[in-house]
Regions:
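Compositionally biased linear targeting/interaction segments
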Residues: 2, 9-296
């Protein structure tokens, strides 16, 4: 018969073996769980990306508009996409505002800068510096800056809204929260069917005319971008609503429009707790949309 001490030692060895085996099994189980979670997360990211791009493909179709149903689609409780489409024509096209240095357009720009908190001196300085930034010569505007020791404007058209921050004396504007949201470089003109109250005021339109025009344009629900909107297609009729006579309309020709085809489209795809977003600026109006910006 085996001595008790040897039996105890054997039992301890068995217990240690069981403990080690249990630890190994537990570690393996945790590794498997982590691997499953990792692959699950990867799958979520793939699904969210697929939803996002599916939504964008739908939005870019020539027949799809802001009023089209199905722009917010759920395929499962945690799987789907949401599309937002906003007219880029409701913003101020900075390139058109400074093109040709037309006094009436520069006046609109200066009014906007005033609303952004810039005083007279800051407005005059920034506008002249902006003109020096984009013109094709080294002749300085009255309040502008051309070649200096540590500043050389490129003397070419703007390439992006962000580039405005490189213009001399742009600091006061850059410190104004959300200023970039008011500007665009992609529209074909200021779309009066998309412009809000603040933008319409920049054209020198009085408040009663703005109120009446927006009530008509927005329809019974008082909201832009809904099926009951009444978008006007005749510039003379719009001019009458806004109190703009023929002379004033002619002075704004080439800057205002009634149907800008440029849209900023944001498609957000979701899968579980993962979301993916694509932002596109596109000009629609034919079978193949013109992509002006694609950002993921």
């Amino acid at each position: 018969m085996r001595p008790p001490r040897r039996q105890a030692s054997a039992l301890l060895l068995v217990l240690w073996a069981l403990i080690l085996l249990s630890g190994a099994v537990f570690a393996y189980a945790k590794w498997i769980q982590a691997d499953i979670q990792l692959h699950g997360q990867v799958n979520r990211e793939i699904e969210a990306g697929a939803m996002c791009h599916s939504g964008m493909a739908l939005a870019l179709h020539e027949l799809v508009t802001k009023e089209t149903e199905g722009l917010d689609e759920d395929f499962a409780p945690d799987l789907g996409f949401r599309i937002r489409m906003v007219s880029e024509g409701g913003k101020l096209n900075i390139s058109l505002l400074i093109q040709g240095e037309q006094p009436e357009r520069l006046d609109i720009l200066k009014k906007w800068l005033e609303g952004r908190g810039l005083d007279y001196k800051e407005r005059e300085s920034f506008v002249d510096c902006l003109l020096d930034f984009v013109d094709g010569d080294d002749v300085k505007h009255l309040n502008g800056v051309e070649d200096d020791t540590d500043y050389q404007p490129p003397n070419r058209p703007l390439e992006s809204i962000d580039e405005i921050e490189q213009v001399a004396n742009s600091g006061p504007l850059a410190r104004s929260p959300g200023w970039k949201d008011d500007l665009t470089m992609f529209s074909t003109g200021l779309d009066l069917n998309a412009a809000n109250e603040d933008v319409l005021r920049l054209l020198g339109i009085s408040e009663p005319y703005i109120v009446r025009f927006l009530q008509t344009r927005r329809g019974r629900d008082g909201v832009d971008g809904t099926p009951d909107d009444q978008l006007l297609a005749d510039m003379k009729i719009v001019g009458a609503y806004l109190g703009l006579n023929e002379v004033r309309l002619k002075s704004l020709q080439g800057f205002i429009t009634l149907k800008d085809p440029t849209l900023r489209i944001i498609s957000e795809g979701r899968s579980g707790n993962v979301t993916r977003q694509v932002e596109v600026v596109a000009r629609k109006g034919g079978a193949t949309p013109q992509i002006l910006l694609w950002k993921e």
